[in-house]
Amino acid sequence: MPRRAASPAASEHEIDILGSIFANDNDTEVKAKAKKRTGGHDEIDLDIDALLNGAEDGGDGDDEALIALQQAASFRKTTNLKGKTGKKSGGFQAMGLNPSLLQAITRKGFAVPTPIQRKSIPLILDRRDVVGMARTGSGKTAAFVIPMIERLRAHSARVGARALIMSPSRELALQTLKVVKEFGKGTDLKTVLLVGGDSLEDQFGFMTTNPDIIIATPGRFLHLKVEMSLDLSSIKYVVFDEADRLFEMGFATQLTEILHSLPPSRQTLLFSATLPRSLVEFARAGLQDPSLVRLDAETKISPDLESAFFSVKGAEKEGALLHILQDVIKMPTGTPEGFKEDKDEGSKKRKRGPDRPNAKEKPTEHSTIIFTATKFHVEYLTSILVQAGYAVSHAYGALDQTARKIQVEDFRRGKTNILVVTDVAARGIDIPVLANVINYDFCDQPKVFVHRVGRTARAGQKGWSYSLVSDIDAPYLLDLQLFLGRRLVVGQDTSAGANFASDVVLGALQRNSIETNVEWVEKVVQESHDIALMRSVVVKAQKQYLRTRVSASSQSAKRARELTASRAWSQPHLIFGINTDDTEALRVEMLAKISGFKPQETVFEIGHGGKGTISEAVEVMKQLRKRAPVRKSKTDKDADDEDEDVPVIKRAKSDESSDEDASFDEDDFVAVNDDSDEELEVTVSNNADSAKNASAWRDSEHFMTYTPRQSNVAEERGYGVNAGSNGANFLEAARDVAMDIANDEKSTSFGAPTRTTMRWDKKNAKYVSRAHDEDGSRGNTKMIRGESGVKIAASFKSGRFDRWRKDNRLGKLPGVGEAETGLPRGMGGGGFGGGGRRFNHKREDAPKEADKFRDDYHVRKKRVAEAKEKRIGKFRDGEGSKREIKNNDDIRKARKIKELKMRKNARPARKKKN
């Protein structure tokens, strides 16, 4: 019997009962379709075979089976409507985003939010001010773009921008614009880009199109704000992207002026890779009860990271670096084997090559990043490593942005194995998972070390960090050991078993390899004049760096003297295995004694040790030794210092014993406040007599200590003014993560522009400070006061916008809050989003006039004739032009020509007949 066609149902939720009547025609087909429809879903525990087989027992079984199948299919459709996927909650679907934005996120390839996105997006959607701090490349841009698009939704017909994103550089602004365009494809939001280097007239046109989102650099945006007298009262959403770089590049004045013009009801977000102290003060002033979001709060260093610290001499660091690359990492020379050049680099459709590594994969097996102190170290080490045959990329703060992008892209694609950078440059670079990190110049702060090694051992992968520690770096190593709370293993100490992942393992490198590499480096320096000049500059830069870096603690400095003087300091590192042969150790010890040998004789006494005649100079030196007292050595002075500290300790103990009856202890007070060492200054007297009578001047009844006796500090703190607010919590959290990074070019403070502070005054024939020019005290540069009171350049208000508006015949523009009007013809709607084209780089210039003395005279003459015929450039307003109104210059020129002709002809003009 042939199968009958199914009768149509009114909706997909209704059941076609005719199918159950003819279900026995092809029972196997029905079972196959049922299994296909329900395969792979566990939402309903349904035994389909049992239901279908129930048709043999009675007629009602088929109806129940098919009804159950239809209900299961309907249930699956309703559960998959949100987000168009059947994924579990916990991703972007659980954040309450609109469907068009979810589709854009899925189209972008984001499946699960990154940790910074998971923590910050809910806070931003709740209209909270956020200070986001995360590792580079963790998705900070999407963390503030997604909530911005969710909040703005669509283009507003009311005049006034609603979102402002400040970026430190043109390249970063372009990158942010690209992300905004990709996430806002399902909306009609208008976005404009305002960066330096573009035409001001074009940007005037962009701002008159009523954009919703402004992505700008501080300098150009402040220029447009002053020139156009922009009203920023409609701004609701402000983002400072890479805020640490904004302050480092000297935009503090511009940011202060812009921040003063924003409404107080705005939502302010501040995202940064690091958190300098100046940025903390800016956040306190510009943000309201901010929430600090950071990712390194639970663990300081990844547990999968293994570290090795090598004790080296300052003059042998280049050889030690080559020894690590050759023998420890075993890095091959030349271009990596797996790298292939992209054949279709010129194709616009190809955005990613097939050989480009994934973001969670290492570019190469031996990918290594080397951190140095200054940009001069970067250039010098790059030249040395290139001479050694390695594929090297480099980057530093003063490097051109395009060159930096090319260098980092080569490293990311696997074209090079090594990237030599400074802390300033590496902070804003998106670097994937690395295999190794080498600290060529040891960091002066433990937080900087954590920031450096945080680029490896990501996503559950193993990683190594290698650090070169010289004698002057030993105090900083001990500070790092205390900060990490790890055990210090020096030399061949195998008593408790060294663990490279949980201990600070210190030792020396293999002496033979270092000497070979040092000799090779000296040979390269002698043969290359350029490298020799670089080395001389590096020596000066190293002195300046050591002079300006943060000092280590005094206790670590005392411990470092003992550490460097010990025998274990020069013992081989445990990474090379346990050395049972003491020959190498004895050799190193002998060389150390020879290098530290200091003869007791002077130059006058050399060669006069025999029984012969003694010269007069020798007799004089003997008499001087008898008269002069024996000088104390450095170790004796240290011992005396330690002896002087003993009474102070006794005094502290006596103070503690006298306060034992108090209800609150001073140690508890310090623990509750948790102040940093820089904010507290303790002055202790070394007078032994006062230490003996420490308790004599205290009166137990009337003496007032700086710690409360009868009150609970925790309770008082709970009743404090800032109790219950997020301001105090932000300050406490920011105190732990605040970190200042040393400049890689000059020793200027963070936030100061990196340029010379003095200039030559020709009039007075002397050097004067540039600060006088910037604040307007000198008459060279005219300054005006902004709305916040700071002085800005008077050139910002030059009248160019008024002239542009007059040339384009624009009247009064609508104010903020008014309904937008249609744009004049030819404006094009300028901008980058939501309709409207951008007319850039299409200006047609007329060719130059033909020169009779040039070989191409006839060619030029022909091109000029064509330009006159086509009305191009300056020939646009010739005879027969639609624009017949002449300007003042044309009228003045025509009158002058007419007067000259009249003088030449010597006769009056011809009068018209009536």
UniProtKB/Swiss-Prot annotation:
Record carries keyword Nuclease: no
Segments for region (Disordered): 333-364, 626-667, 746-786, 807-857, 872-891
Location(s), subcellular: Nucleus, Nucleolus
Limits of the Helicase C-terminal domain: 341-502
Polar residues bias spans: 748-757
One Gene Ontology MF term: ATP hydrolysis activity
Domain of life: Eukaryota
Motif DEAD box positions after renumbering to this chain: 241-244
Residue ranges, compositional bias (Gly residues): 825-837
Residue ranges of domain Helicase ATP-binding in the record: 121-293
Alphabetized Gene3D superfamilies for the sequence: P-loop containing nucleotide triphosphate hydrolases
Broad class of enzyme this protein falls into: hydrolase
Keywords, sorted A to Z: ATP-binding, Helicase, Hydrolase, Nucleotide-binding, Nucleus, Ribosome biogenesis, RNA-binding, rRNA processing
Function: ATP-binding RNA helicase involved in the biogenesis of 60S ribosomal subunits and is required for the normal formation of 25S and 5.8S rRNAs.
PANTHER family: ATP-DEPENDENT RNA HELICASE RHLE-RELATED, RNA HELICASE
Free-text domain note: The Q motif is unique to and characteristic of the DEAD box family of RNA helicases and controls ATP binding and hydrolysis.
Name the record gives this protein: ATP-dependent RNA helicase DBP10
Gene, per the UniProt record: DBP10
